[in-house]
Amino acid sequence: MSLKKSPFFELRSGSVDTLLFTVKTTDLDALRAELVKRFEATPEFFADDVVAIDVRRLADGERVALADIRQMLNDVRMRPVGVVALATQGWAGEAGLPLLEARDRRAPAAKPADEAEPAAVPAVETAAAPAAAAAPEQSSDPAPTLVQAGGQTLVIDRPLRSGQQIYAKGDLVVLAPVSHGAEIIAEGNIHIYAPLRGRALAGVHGNHDARIFCTCLEPELISIAGIYRTTENPLPADVLGKSVQIRLEEEKLMIEPLRLT
């Protein structure tokens, strides 16, 4: 075969980042139900994102119907491109998807210089909400406001009205109120130095180390890495309307008062 370089195409070694969808159960009905619950409130977050199905967490001898999982992911608008499996999981190559190699990488937590210390009081612990958040109020705006920043901190210094949406690829700092029906989304941390009455979603591409900091917590929805809580599960009095930080601990949202003075 000729090794002459072609002016029309090039083949070379490379790597592409994808999300890993880690399968931890063989109960596909339970898996489907959990997918629906996670995505029904925020279906656009992973829309058209490529994903690799990771079956390495399954116990020895366990196997799943990868074709069914592939369809589940398509149903929530994700695009499966391959399977990550152990050498002993030979069945993983039978679904028509290529076998991929993966190096697990956990996104590092951002450490703001002026991050406030949490008060030494018990945290509020909550799991994912059992139902989707209520639909946002109607707005006279013709379309949501969408702002993107290429991995750097995005600062918003104007009030956000119902129907407006902000998306930051890094951290997001908001210096004005977030009204009911407004939505702020970040792949990193979110800092809100004003009342939060709409939705705040941090770490939306799976960053479990992301946090939300807020000086007045009155939200419709809060979420980190897909784990969310809505107003259907009322907040305790010691954090409602107060300054707080929100973080993940073992797949649960922890809401902790902040000591700012």
From Swiss-Prot:
What domain of life?
Answer: Bacteria
**What GO biological process terms are annotated to this protein in UniProt?**
cell morphogenesis; division septum assembly; regulation of cell division; regulation of cell septum assembly
- Locations of Low complexity compositional bias? 118-144
Aminoacyl-tRNA synthetase is among the record's keywords: no
User: PANTHER family, from UniProt?
Assistant: SEPTUM SITE-DETERMINING PROTEIN MINC
Protein family per UniProt:
Belongs to the MinC family.
Q: What does this protein do?
A: Cell division inhibitor that blocks the formation of polar Z ring septums. Rapidly oscillates between the poles of the cell to destabilize FtsZ filaments that have formed before they mature into polar Z rings. Prevents FtsZ polymerization.
Can you name this protein? Probable septum site-determining protein MinC
Q: Which organism is it from?
A: Burkholderia orbicola (strain MC0-3)
Q: Which gene encodes it?
A: minC
